[in-house]
């Protein structure tokens, strides 16, 4: 159990690794109950009877069952005496009026007030507040808009709303290089020529299943007319699951992919700020390599999915977000920090009369604060560099770009802030460039790519059960076995969950390489490889620790002799 906003990232990761949706939903219900019992009750024991109120408790039967299960278990553990003849489940009630108990409470309190208290004053006061009073309140509490005026917007658009360079679109002479980025909310693919020219790109919202996302992307690449593949690299959440399934040559760590994709266009970049659907990555570069890295590891308050959710609640297409936000003549000041509290702040600003475009502008304005200060913990931007590159799908939103530019230049007046020409596909481009490096480094070795027809015909099953739990250490990771039908696969007839010939098993949910195997002989091979890595790459930190506490010869006590 943790922050509800960041839990979305966990759910997306589980979907990408093949965990069934129904199991993820059940886990979310469990997390809600754990959070309430562990945090809100502060060690106290809810006494029978218990009322479950509010919309989620009323409409989600699974949440009701989670409450009944865990409260019953808690009462049993703490030896709570239940009324005679009643079981725990019968003492947990969801009334039909669960949505309206706060309203009913207001009625009860009002009925108990002395006569003459809180007498209805008519609609004139309310009308005045709607038409005039809230405008005065807004003027006192709000701030300037994202754009100071028409001239400010015109100059910004002239500098940043430059049409990105189009893909060449020509047919490649020779095998192409493909890079795919399977992100939390989107899937992207790019095609490079042997000369590393961009030939084709596609960008789509994720369907929530990595194999289906891969089928969709490769179908588009095939239809674009690139039959011969010389190298394939994957990055993003789904890379490890899909590498063997589609026959990728390499799986590239996200930081490496994004840095490579940026340095190809901006070799003198100092800082890369990548804002995606559910994560924020800040990469600080020194001499063309990543010297420091910041990730929102415990909160996703600065992500793009939050902006998308707010736009959807206002029934505004995401593509129209910036246009709507730029219409605002003023905007409220939203609090930096936790996305859950930020949502509460938005509701509070709505009560004050702020319109949709004003709140959307304010949300774009607070995003850089959350990205750099709250998530990145970077107070002094001037210390990290002078050239900042903005990328990631969220930076397709020009309102966010405007807010980022103003924030960075407010901290570093001489900063050069540039927008990646392919902000959404930067990771995929980096992966494709890594595929090109792999092909050159191997002397043109044939790619492992399985082929468009094989990927289109993929069928699979997913299993998470007691038999899939890893037993190689006390952690007991809950793994998921994803079995994919592939021609020529050997199967695993000896497994606890036998797999027939013609099927390949991909294991996800493990915390270490040992979790990728089922058989003890396979485990011995993994351990041997790990020992080989230790021998080849010494543990420098351990060497420094030993050297720091080793007594030097000069300090050693003299030996009597």
Language-model features: where?
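Gly/Thr-rich phosphate-binding beta-strand-loop-beta motif of the actin/hexokinase/Hsp70
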Residues: 165-199, 269-289, 330, 469-484
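Glycine-rich phosphate-binding loop plus the immediately following alpha-helix
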Residues: 1-3, 8-14, 99-102, 108-112, ...
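Glycine-rich phosphate-binding/hydrolytic loop that grips phosphoryl groups
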Residues: 81-83, 91-133, 260-261, 307-309, ...
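Conserved phosphate-binding catalytic cores of ATP/NTP-utilizing and phosphoryl-transfer enzymes
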Residues: 37, 41-44, 103-107, 158-173, ...
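Short beta-strand-loop/turn "lid" adjacent to the catalytic site in phosphate-handling enzymes
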Residues: 194, 202-206, 221-255, 291-292
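Phosphate/ATP-binding catalytic cores across multiple sugar-kinase/actin-like superfamilies
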Residues: 24-48, 155-166, 362-384, 551-555
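Flexible inter-domain linker/hinge segments
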Residues: 112-179, 183, 438-560
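Glycine-rich phosphate-binding loops at beta-strand->alpha-helix junctions
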Residues: 42-79, 95-99, 235-238, 366, ...
């Amino acid at each position: 159990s943790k922050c509800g906003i960041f839990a979305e990232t966990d759910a997306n990761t589980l979907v990408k690794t093949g965990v069934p949706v129904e199991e993820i939903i059940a886990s979310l219900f469990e997390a809600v109950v754990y959070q309430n019992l562990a945090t809100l009750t502060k060690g106290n024991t809810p006494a029978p009877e218990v009322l479950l109120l509010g919309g989620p408790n009323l409409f989600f039967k699974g949440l009701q069952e989670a409450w009944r299960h865990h409260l019953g278990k808690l009462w049993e553990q703490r030896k709570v005496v239940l009324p005679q003849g009643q079981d725990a489940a019968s003492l947990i009630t969801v009334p039909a009026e669960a949505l309206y108990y706060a309203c009913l409470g207001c009625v009860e309190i009002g009925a108990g007030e002395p006569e003459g208290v809180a007498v209805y004053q008519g609609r004139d006061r309310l009308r005045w507040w709607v038409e005039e009073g809230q405008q005065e309140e807004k003027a006192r509490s709000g701030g300037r808009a994202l754009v100071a005026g028409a001239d400010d917007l015109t100059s910004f658009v002239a500098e940043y709303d430059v049409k990105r360079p189009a893909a060449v679109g020509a047919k490649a002479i020779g095998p192409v290089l493909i890079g795919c980025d399977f992100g939390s909310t989107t899937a992207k693919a790019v095609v490079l020529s042997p000369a590393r020219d961009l030939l084709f790109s596609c960008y789509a919202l994720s369907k929530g299943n990595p194999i289906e996302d891969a089928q969709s992307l490769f179908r588009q690449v095939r239809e674009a007319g690139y039959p011969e593949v010389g190298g394939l690299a994957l990055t993003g959440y789904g890379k490890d699951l899909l590498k063997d399934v589609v026959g990728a040559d390499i799986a590239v760590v996200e930081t490496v992919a994004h840095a490579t994709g940026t340095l190809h266009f901006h070799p003198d970049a100092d800082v890369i700020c990548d804002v995606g659907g559910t994560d924020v990555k800040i990469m600080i570069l020194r001499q063309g390599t990543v010297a420091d890295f910041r990730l929102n590891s415990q909160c996703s308050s600065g992500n793009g999915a939050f902006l998308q959710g707010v736009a959807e609640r206002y029934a505004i297409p995401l593509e129209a977000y910036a246009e709507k936000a730029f219409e605002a003549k003023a905007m409220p000041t939203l609090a930096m920090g936790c996305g859950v509290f930020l949502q509460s702040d938005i509701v509070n600003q709505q009560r004050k009369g702020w319109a949709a475009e004003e709140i959307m502008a304010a949300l774009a304005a607070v995003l850089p604060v959350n990205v750099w200060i709250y998530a990145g913990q970077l107070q002094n931007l001037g210390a990290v560099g002078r050239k900042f590159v903005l990328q990631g799908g969220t930076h397709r939103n020009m309102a966010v770009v405007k807010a980022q530019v103003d924030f960075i230049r407010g901290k570093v007046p001489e900063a050069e802030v540039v927008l990646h020409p392919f902000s959404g596909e930067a990771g995929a481009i980096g992966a494709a460039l890594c595929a090109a490096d792999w092909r050159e480094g191997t002397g043109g070795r044939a790619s492992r790519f399985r082929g468009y027809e094989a990927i289109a015909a993929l069928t699979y099953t997913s299993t998470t059960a007691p038999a899939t739990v890893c037993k190689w250490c006390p952690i007991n990771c809950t793994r998921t076995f994803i079995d994919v039908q592939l021609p020529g696969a050997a199967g695993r007839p000896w497994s606890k969950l036998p797999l027939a010939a013609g099927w390949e098993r991909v294991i996800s949910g493990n915390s270490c390489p040992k979790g990728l195997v089922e058989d003890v002989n396979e485990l011995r091979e993994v351990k041997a490889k790990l020992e080989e890595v230790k021998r080849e790459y010494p543990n420098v930190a351990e060497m420094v620790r030993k050297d720091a506490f080793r007594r030097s010869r000069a300090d050693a006590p003299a030996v009597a002799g």
